[in-house]
A protein has these predicted regions:
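Conserved P-loop NTPase motor module
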Residues: 1-2, 9-21, 135, 141-179
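Conserved P-loop NTPase motor cores
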Residues: 3-141
Length: 179
């Protein structure tokens, strides 16, 4: 598919997601603010973007900027975003301009929770740039040595926690090795 067509379809998909978030979230917000609904009964909206680097990168700034707007506003409507990718370097390819890097950096700065799993050691400079002052030097140097299921949870404005995610055999069977 041509890049222009993909970008147009992506714009439309993200726009429709945003409209749906408002359509669901605005009535929930009004109902919550008028004390007519319990917290646990609020309908929430979540967009999960797997292989996020295909959409969010320095070569697709329109999508990144659209998601920035979503990140800034969605919480008001009980909406959220999850991005998943294997390597931070895919978001910021070599040779990216500082302006485009700043857009990606802001996108991650606005992200409340960041689960950082093992990355290759050649990604450390990019991790340091994108997560500036969010990870200590010790945490950064430990990232390439994280084992299977181990991660660092970086919580915006609070702290970082290193832990291991254990997956049951039943859960593994559901995904059949990630398929």
């Amino acid at each position: 598919m041509k890049s222009e067509i993909f970008d147009a379809q992506l714009f439309n998909a993200l726009f429709l997601c945003w409209q749906n978030c408002i359509h669901v979230g605005l009535p929930m917000k009004k109902t919550w603010e008028s004390n007519q609904i319990d917290w646990q009964d609020i309908t929430r909206f979540l967009i999960f973007i797997d292989e996020a680097h295909k959409i969010i990168n320095t070569n697709k700034l329109e999508a990144a900027e659209q998601l920035l707007k979503f990140e800034r506003e969605a919480r008001k409507y009980f909406g959220g975003l999850i991005y998943a990718s294997q390597s931070i370097r895919d978001f910021v390819p070599e040779g990216s301009s500082q302006d485009s890097i700043n857009v990606i950096k802001t996108l991650f700065e606005l992200t409340q929770y960041k689960f950082i799993m093992r990355q290759d050691s050649n990604a450390l400079d990019t991790l340091s740039t994108i997560f500036h002052n969010q990870l200590t030097e010790t945490e950064l140097s430990h990232i390439p040595r994280l084992g299977k299921g181990e991660c660092i949870l970086s919580i915006k404005g609070d702290e970082n926690i290193e832990f291991k995610v254990d997956v049951s055999e039943a859960d593994l069977a559901i995904f059949q090795g990630g398929a």
